[in-house]
Design a protein with these regions (language model features):
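Eukaryotic polytopic
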Residues: 2-51, 55, 63-225
Length: 225
């Protein structure tokens, strides 16, 4: 799912990197670079912790860091709302809100759920997706368009998105019972959220497919020229 409009989709082949950048562009490059590093750290920690200490100890080693890294994504809603980036506010807010629910409303409230494989698979899906996405924006905003990053950006979601969504749904589902014991209304809210996930997931997935088609059309136009 995109949080920013692709700044390099219509760039002419052979165009040299920009020599000067506005404050806006420099800010976005820095923002995306920092987030790429943060999510790379999450990915590295998860991949190290699983074989070293097992799934049950992943959360103590990376949970707090992931929680605040994901919370930083609130800025993406602000970027879209203020026009700093050309991105659909609805889809941006939808993804950010769903992830905040997972890290704050579920795992933070019921940390024992993080011992399941669903938590680790969710983090892997999130972190790989975000490392690729933020790296892609760093390059394109800087005037580059690496083929490998572009390919990963618009193809890996076919695998990572279903993995992430299924992991999220599993965690939400397994939270309903302990949430009911804590507060009935919370369990009802989670059940409602699961129902929303069905159309919501479809919207986000088709949005990403539309972004991919847009890029493919742009490349065809460039080749024709």
């Amino acid at each position: 799912m995109d949080s920013q409009e692709d700044p390099g989709a219509m760039r002419k082949p052979g165009l040299k990197p920009l020599r000067s950048s506005s404050f806006k562009k420099q800010y976005l490059i820095l923002y995306n670079f920092v987030n790429a590093i943060l999510w790379l750290t999450v990915l590295g920690r998860v991949l190290l912790l699983i074989p070293l200490v097992g799934l049950g100890r992943v959360y103590p080693g990376v949970g707090r860091f992931t929680k605040w890294t994901q919370t930083l994504a609130v800025l993406e809603v602000v970027h879209a709302a203020t026009g700093l980036v050309r991105a659909p506010i609805s889809t941006t807010a939808m993804q950010v809100a769903s992830r905040l629910l997972l890290v704050w409303g579920i795992i933070f409230q019921f940390p024992f759920l993080a011992k399941s494989a669903g938590y680790s698979s969710m983090l892997i899906a999130w972190s790989v997706t975000e490392v690729v996405r933020y790296s892609y924006f760093v390059f394109t905003l800087s005037g580059y368009s690496p083929g490998l990053i572009s390919w990963l950006r618009y193809n890996t979601f076919y695998v990572l998105y279903p993995l992430g969504i299924s992991s999220e749904c599993w965690l939400i589902y397994t939270t309903i019972k302990p949430a009911k014991e804590k507060r009935q209304v919370y369990a009802w809210i989670l059940q409602l959220i699961l129902l929303v996930y069905i159309p919501g997931s479809y919207i986000l997935f088709t949005h990403m497919m539309a972004q991919r088609r847009k890029l493919m059309r742009a490349k065809q136009i460039q080749k024709a020229e």
